[in-house]
């Protein structure tokens, strides 16, 4: 069996792992591709310490982002209901539908915080009334907001 070499990835490589991972690869792969193109570095004790420090910083930053998402979720809950005005035809049927972009604009107007419309899931809304939309604020944090559609 061929000897394997341990290297530390300096950027994400699709078949191996992400930045900072220690992986074992064939010597030729490391020597001819990973090392010359700067995608990896040889494993040394100092590099391992750098990786540990970097991972600790990333973990702290991720916890901070998660806490901000939780705080924003509570802010949305205290606001309670967002109102969206749309034109209505006869029989209370809307011209068009209420989209996730409309919900994002209503939330941004009330909270002054940008939300990506792709993170909002809105049911099909074709009538006036109250509805619930789901917002993914973080990988582990979701919120539900009440939407009232008026004319």
Swiss-Prot record:
CC annotations in GO: ribonucleoprotein complex; ribosome
Domain of life: Bacteria
GO molecular function, a single term: rRNA binding
SUPFAM superfamilies given in the database record: L9 N-domain-like, Ribosomal protein L9 C-domain
An example Gene Ontology biological process: translation
A Pfam short name: Ribosomal_L9_C
Keyword hit for Coiled coil: no
Transmembrane annotation, as ranges: none
InterPro entries referenced in this protein's UniProt entry, alphabetically: Ribosomal_bL9, Ribosomal_bL9/RNase_H1_N, Ribosomal_bL9_bac/chp, Ribosomal_bL9_C, Ribosomal_bL9_C_sf, Ribosomal_bL9_N, Ribosomal_bL9_N_sf
Keyword list, A-Z: Ribonucleoprotein, Ribosomal protein, RNA-binding, rRNA-binding
PANTHER family in the cross-refs: 50S RIBOSOMAL PROTEIN L9
Functional note: Binds to the 23S rRNA.
Family as reported in the entry's similarity comment: Belongs to the bacterial ribosomal protein bL9 family.
Protein name: Large ribosomal subunit protein bL9
Lineage of producing organism: Bacteria, Bacillati, Cyanobacteriota, Cyanophyceae, Synechococcales
């Amino acid at each position: 069996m061929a000897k394997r070499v341990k290297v530390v990835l300096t950027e994400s490589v699709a078949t191996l792992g992400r930045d900072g991972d220690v992986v074992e690869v064939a010597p030729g792969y490391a020597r001819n591709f990973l090392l010359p193109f700067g995608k990896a570095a040889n494993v040394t004790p100092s590099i391992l310490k750098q990786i540990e420090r970097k991972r600790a910083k990333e973990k702290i930053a991720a916890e901070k982002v998660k806490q901000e998402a939780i705080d924003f979720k509570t802010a949305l809950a205290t606001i309670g209901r967002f109102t969206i005005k749309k034109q209505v035809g006869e029989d209370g049927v809307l011209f068009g539908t209420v989209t996730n972009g409309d919900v994002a604009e209503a939330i941004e107007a009330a909270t002054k915080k940008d939300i990506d419309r792709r993170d909002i899931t809105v049911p099909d809304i074709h009538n006036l009334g109250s509805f619930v939309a789901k917002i993914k604020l973080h990988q582990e944090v979701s919120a539900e907001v009440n939407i009232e559609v008026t004319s």
